[in-house]
């Protein structure tokens, strides 16, 4: 396994403390990797800053060609990446290869094209004798912090728009799941000029803090927890850096009496438990109108009970383990607290799986109330709650009564209601009669404590640029 880091075009070993990297399906240590030192963090940022002088002035065509080459080598090495992701994250191998790798490749190809479509406003005379134009220019060095749930996918979401816009990047993947990012480093070093991409390894305190606080970093992009976002915003406040935050969610799934129940069951069975529920858009907070509540709970419980947890390399496995022992304990604690309320009923699951690895049974909880922690707090595991509601006004208020604002869905056959409710939901994305669908052309990002800024789409590309006015007297 490639375990070296990329700094200024060279693969190097870290000079800091060694950290274990685990296989969550077994609990075994895969390998130990040395963190970068503070001096290596500084070297990576300074390399990126030096490379920006030239990379920031390259043509969109040249940047697009590099991104397309990177997309091609990821596609060519798709099986290798999928196997690394499966071993390091516990993802079913078939899901990593068939679902994630094509989407990752598409992200780089999309932004390769988008790089050539990013324009400022056409020049015009708004003051006699002067011509004004609007430029969209890169910022400089971007520090990107990627999470552990979709390591390579999130690296793509961070790298592609930043590079397409002409920035240079220092990426820190999660210390829990670094292996695909380090493999990416090996392939990217021969495609991009030295310093344009730097990929480090280490924990937040020892590596993340000196990286995000570095005076030459102009922007910090994070996908992670609210707590991590709060820390980075506070840590970087004195230097007034631009920040781009995607901080999780607790997606409301609003199911009206007239919804297609079979479609809801099929959708939640898939989109509530994909990646073992470790997804910030997971369909995890169901509001079911009282007329169909009992039927939905019964049918969904039966469907969830058929989900198969197992070894990641088994073609029949639908759910792998959680990412770490610590996270398994967090998920288990959240469910135990829900059970202790007395009014929440476990329809299926509700316990750790016996044996090796960090497995938690796919769980459906019914009878949850609006103020329950299981409804209000992100669990980030294979746990879905169901709450009954009376009418449209009530459920819209309940759905919006959350600190999160990332994703939501509405299930109804009434087109007018679908538009009406979607317009009132305080979420970055609302799906109607589906959930979880993402495409590179559409923006992904939240409101409230789910953060700000957009990933993917031209809006995502714009987030990595600065708007500048140039006026010429003539």
UniProtKB/Swiss-Prot annotation:
One of its GO terms (molecular function) is NAD binding. CDD domains: ALDH_ABALDH-YdcW. Pathway: Amine and polyamine degradation; putrescine degradation; 4-aminobutanoate from 4-aminobutanal: step 1/1; Amino-acid degradation. The keyword Nucleus does not apply. It catalyses: 4-aminobutanal + NAD(+) + H2O = 4-aminobutanoate + NADH + 2 H(+); 5-aminopentanal + NAD(+) + H2O = 5-aminopentanoate + NADH + 2 H(+). Homotetramer. Catalyzes the oxidation 4-aminobutanal (gamma-aminobutyraldehyde) to 4-aminobutanoate (gamma-aminobutyrate or GABA). This is the second step in one of two pathways for putrescine degradation, where putrescine is converted into 4-aminobutanoate via 4-aminobutanal. Also functions as a 5-aminopentanal dehydrogenase in a a L-lysine degradation pathway to succinate that proceeds via cadaverine, glutarate and L-2-hydroxyglutarate. This is Gamma-aminobutyraldehyde dehydrogenase. It comes from Shigella flexneri serotype 5b (strain 8401). The gene is patD.
